[in-house]
């Protein structure tokens, strides 16, 4: 199949994402991520860290969607997404040039986002385990996004930027009391996975 044929398959996660935004069915979340993972697998012809990161995201998303105020489940969700980001970072590092730029980008992102968390989010989080999980997750997110700047493909960087934005919206909604932010969590999350799948298609050559 040509790269354009694989790109056409992105209609599957796009349709599932659009339907999920109007119907509260978790199965649609899984369809978005799993179909993106299938596209990555088909395009690359072998399993890869990106493929496994998308698969792990399904389990992490399940815990987040069903946490219902349970801190333990919330922590499982964060832990799952931490693992997914570690896999995304691994995938980035396979292509990235370890020049000074990504290290500088990581440092700036970690410092800026750390300041945001310290001032707006962490003071509102009473559970010490949750605070630690949030900080560690911020660091892996900053690393995957920062190092993506040294790897080819704007779609991958934009995808990782979308997941950071989605996570920020979750923090705003769950900890800062900004309920309006919740409306954009799923669209940005789904866009992340679709862009990551697109990045694999672009690698093939469009």
Question: Residue spans of the language-model regions?
Answer:
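Polytopic alpha-helical membrane-helix bundles and their juxtamembrane interface segments
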Residues: 1-206
């Amino acid at each position: 199949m040509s790269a354009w044929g694989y790109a056409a398959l992105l209609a599957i996660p796009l349709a599932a994402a659009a339907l999920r935004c109007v119907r509260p069915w978790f199965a649609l979340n899984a369809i978005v991520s799993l179909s993106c993972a299938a596209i990555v697998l088909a395009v690359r012809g072998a399993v890869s860290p990106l493929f496994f990161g998308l698969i792990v995201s399904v389990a992490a998303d399940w815990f987040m969607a069903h946490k219902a105020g349970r801190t333990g489940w919330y922590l499982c969700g964060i832990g799952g997404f931490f693992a997914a980001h570690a896999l995304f970072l691994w995938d980035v590092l396979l292509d990235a040039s370890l020049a000074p730029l990504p290290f500088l980008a990581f440092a700036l992102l970690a410092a800026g986002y750390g300041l945001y968390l310290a001032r707006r989010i962490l003071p509102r989080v009473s559970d010490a385990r949750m605070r630690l999980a949030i900080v560690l997750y911020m660091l892996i997110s900053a690393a995957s996004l920062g190092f993506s700047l040294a790897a080819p493909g704007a779609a991958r960087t934009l995808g990782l930027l979308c997941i950071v934005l989605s996570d920020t919206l979750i923090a705003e909604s769950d900890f800062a009391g900004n309920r309006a932010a919740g409306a954009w969590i799923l669209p940005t999350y789904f866009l992340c996975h679709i862009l990551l799948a697109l990045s694999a298609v672009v690698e093939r050559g469009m």
